[in-house]
Amino acid sequence: MIYQDYDIIPLKENYDGSVLEPKHFLPLIPLVLLNGVSGIAVGWSTEILPRSMSDLIEATLAAIDNKKKFPDILPNYEYLGCNVRGIGDNAYEFVGKVVVDGSSIIVHELPPDLSLEKFKDRLNKMEDEEQIQTYVDRSTKDIKIEVRFKRGSINGWTESKAIEFLKLRSKKTERIVVLDWDGNNIKQYESVEKLVRDFVEWRVSFYAVRYKKLIADATYQLNWNQALKLCYDKGLPAFLPKAKNRAEIITKIKEITAKIVIDEPQQDRLAALPSYRWAQDAYNDVLSNIAELSSTIKDYQAILDDPDKMRAIYRQEVSALKKLHNVER
């Protein structure tokens, strides 16, 4: 459900012009913030930290609703449970988790830039320098390292003191540099909020593209049904047995439908209809189709003419994504 509107995705030629490929996709939320990215190019660098799907959905809904108070979208590493807080200017502090237990410190989480192997190297050095007595690594899926000290040497230590001693605090500064949503230019954002708000305004503009296409597709079908009705009304069923060949049938269809816009495939489709399709009950089906398509086009046009309705539909689809995500968690 993250990706919508596959039939209106802008296309471009591939490197040799042999096929068309997507210029970009149309996700409901700004996926550039989901997994994070780090990179360097000539004159530019980017460092985008990952976020949770839930937070991105909530931020997108807030932007759709034009809320002045925007939710915090703190970095989130799904494989870590460390504490995170913003410290201003797109900088964040990550803090590991520990428990002080008698003469031991139990480490339950590391900051994102500190791997288990690097931390164990650090502990080995601290053990060599007699800063700690020893340590036991009981980590499996989750981090669990018991760092042992001499009896009484850490009496009164707080978790904060233990974190500082073991250097389980790190900082990262985000630099949000991305290709714009159409994939044409490099753009730098001063904040995650600005990026999300900008994305939402870009994404909602494609709802107009969606409904223009829906109207065009429905109109194409309506024209064919109206042409079929005219063929009934203008005596094409009676003409068919007299026609010498298919070319005469096509010529007759063109005469009857001269004032209706249909293309050659639609003309061929009319000419190829089996005889039972010219019965009275089939004619009634055509009348029903015309009425239904006309009503559908009217509904689509009402949505296209009202930006608030298109925004509301966008909101409904993001809300449905939120519901699905909550079920799958």
Predicted feature locations:
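Conserved mixed alpha/beta core segments that line enzyme active sites in large multi-domain catalysts
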Residues: 2-30
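C-terminal interaction appendages of subunits in large macromolecular complexes
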Residues: 4-5, 24, 31, 35-329
